[in-house]
Amino acid sequence: PMTDQKTYTQTPWSLKDLYDSFDDPKYQETFDEIKRGVENFQAYREQLSPDISEDLFIGMITTYEHFYRLMSRLDGFVQLAFAQDTQDQEAQAAVAKVDQFQAEMSNRTLFFNLWWKGLDDKNAQRLLDASGDFRYWLVTMRNFKDFTLSEPEEKVINIKDVTGVRALNMLYDSI
């Protein structure tokens, strides 16, 4: 038996759950909120020590998680907008802006990753035991400690990736 065939008109997906547009004030405000979060996080640098309290440590990584989620939202928005139309100049510029912003923010919080990877196993285990849902992320980060460079070198790599690998990938995606 034949069934009735229906025709559907393809429409672009809506990104309004993230932001209304690149001109959306909330989109612009997210950059500022991330900057404030990173500045607050940087204040923890002086408090990092092997005997840091579990509560302070959890507070730190909760702060980190908050601005990281915001960064993921920004990145998701620009990447989806770009995927919608790889020839869209505004989307291309937004991807480049967010990539650069991510590298800058990553460089400003890199101290934590390096401290965590360099922490002795006994204190790392103590903090892992208190870390709850953050445990997997923290364990994964420590797995890369043998492949981690100094802070200045890691910062150069972050910036290089924006103009190197990521820029090349974007070029290929545009073609």
Model-derived regions, located:
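A well-structured
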Residues: 2-175
